[in-house]
Amino acid sequence: MKMPSAEVPTIDVSPLFGDDAQEKVRVGQEINKACRGSGFFYAANHGVDVQRLQDVVNEFHRTMSPQEKYDLAIHAYNKNNSHVRNGYYMAIEGKKAVESFCYLNPSFSEDHPEIKAGTPMHEVNSWPDEEKHPSFRPFCEEYYWTMHRLSKVLMRGFALALGKDERFFEPELKEADTLSSVSLIRYPYLEDYPPVKTGPDGEKLSFEDHFDVSMITVLYQTQVQNLQVETVDGWRDLPTSDTDFLVNAGTYLGHLTNDYFPSPLHRVKFVNAERLSLPFFFHAGQHTLIEPFFPDGAPEGKQGNEAVRYGDYLNHGLHSLIVKNGQT
C-alpha cells in the first residue's frame, strides 16, 4: 500500500548567492517553515552539475574490482586498514547488498595538525588506483569543495531563518578543518536479495530509523522513492527529485537551537532497484564551540543546552549510530 507523502517544499536557493537582502530573508523564512514542518526541503537552482555527478559515480561503481574494494575497505571489513571513516564499505554476499565509498577533507594531509596529533575522525584519504581510475580523485576533490561552498551558502539561509545575521555561522565553517564527508552509496538491484530488517509497522527497511549526526545534510539521490520521515501523523514518504538536493538539519543544529530546528527522524525503506544515494554530511571543525541559543526566546524556567566541542559531539554521535543501527 502506498504511504502518504510528507510536505517537502522546493526552495529556490539562488538568492543566497546574491546581494538582494529582501530575497535572502524570504528564503530564510521558507527554510524556517520547512524545518519546523517535516524537517526537509529540496534546494533548487543550486548550481551543481548533478548529471556529471551521476556519471562519475556510476562509472566508479561499475569499474571497481572486488580486490580494489577490499584493498580500500575500512577496518570493519579489512583489519589491515586502520581507517574507520574514509574507505570502502563493502557489500557482503547473502547478508548486505548496499556498498559505498566515503571520503573526507582533501586538506587532511600528513602535515595537518590533527593528522599529526592522531585526532579521531581525521584521516588522510585513500583513493583507488589513479592509473585505473584517472579522473575519479580529481572529480571527488572538486565535488567536495563545491558541496562545502554550497553548504556554507545554505547555512546563510539557516542563519536568517533563526533570526541571525546571514554570516553568523561562517567563522566556524573553515575549509582547512572541516570534518565534512561525502558518501557515494550504491543500492543494487538483485534477483536474490539478502534478508532485510522490518520496522515496527511492518515496513521492510534498508536502514532503520535514525537522526543525521551533522550540522546539515545535503543529499543527492536518483529518482527512486525510498526515504520516509516520522511526522505527528506517523511515517510518511519523502518525495524524490533527481535534479535538486534534499536538505535537513542534523542533530548538532538541533542541539545549537535547543531543538527549535530538530533533526528529523527518518529511515530508508527497502526497494529492490538500482539507485544512488550521495549525501554530503556538512560538519564544522574539531575545535568548533558554538553557544546554543533559543531562536524564539528562552522559555521561562527552561535550561538551554550546554556548548559541546564539535569533534567530541560528532565522535560520540557516530559511535552511537553504529551501536544502534550497525555498521553501514
From Swiss-Prot:
The cofactors it requires, by name, are: Fe cation; L-ascorbate
Query: The Fe2OG dioxygenase domain covers which part of the protein?
Result: 178-284
Annotated residues for binding of N-[(5S)-5-amino-5-carboxypentanoyl]-L-cysteinyl-D-valine: 85, 89, 181, 187, 210, 212, 277
* Pathway(s) per entry: Antibiotic biosynthesis; penicillin G biosynthesis; penicillin G from L-alpha-aminoadipate and L-cysteine and L-valine: step 2/3
This protein's UniProt keywords: Antibiotic biosynthesis, Iron, Metal-binding, Oxidoreductase, Vitamin C
Sites binding Fe(2+) sit at 210, 212, 266
Pfam families registered for this protein in UniProt: 2OG-FeII_Oxy (PF03171), DIOX_N (PF14226)
The EC category is oxidoreductase
Q: Which InterPro entries match?
A: DIOX_N, IPNS-like_FE2OG_OXY, IPNS-like_sf, Iron_ascorbate_oxido_reductase, Isopenicillin-N_synth_CS, Oxoglu/Fe-dep_dioxygenase_dom
* UniProt-annotated binding residues for isopenicillin N: 85, 89, 181, 187, 277
What EC identifiers does the entry list?
A: 1.21.3.1
Catalytic activity entry: N-[(5S)-5-amino-5-carboxypentanoyl]-L-cysteinyl-D-valine + O2 = isopenicillin N + 2 H2O
The entry marks the following residues as binding 2-oxoglutarate, namely: 275
What Gene Ontology terms for biological process does this UniProt record contain? Answer: antibiotic biosynthetic process
Single GO MF descriptor? L-ascorbic acid binding
What does the UniProt function comment say about this protein? Removes, in the presence of oxygen, 4 hydrogen atoms from delta-L-(alpha-aminoadipyl)-L-cysteinyl-D-valine (ACV) to form the azetidinone and thiazolidine rings of isopenicillin.
**Which PANTHER family does this chain map to?**
2-OXOGLUTARATE (2OG) AND FE(II)-DEPENDENT OXYGENASE SUPERFAMILY PROTEIN-RELATED (PTHR47990)
Q: Which family does it belong to?
A: Belongs to the iron/ascorbate-dependent oxidoreductase family.
Please report the name of this protein according to its UniProt entry: Isopenicillin N synthase
Task: Kindly list the organism's lineage.
Answer: Bacteria, Bacillati, Actinomycetota, Actinomycetes, Pseudonocardiales
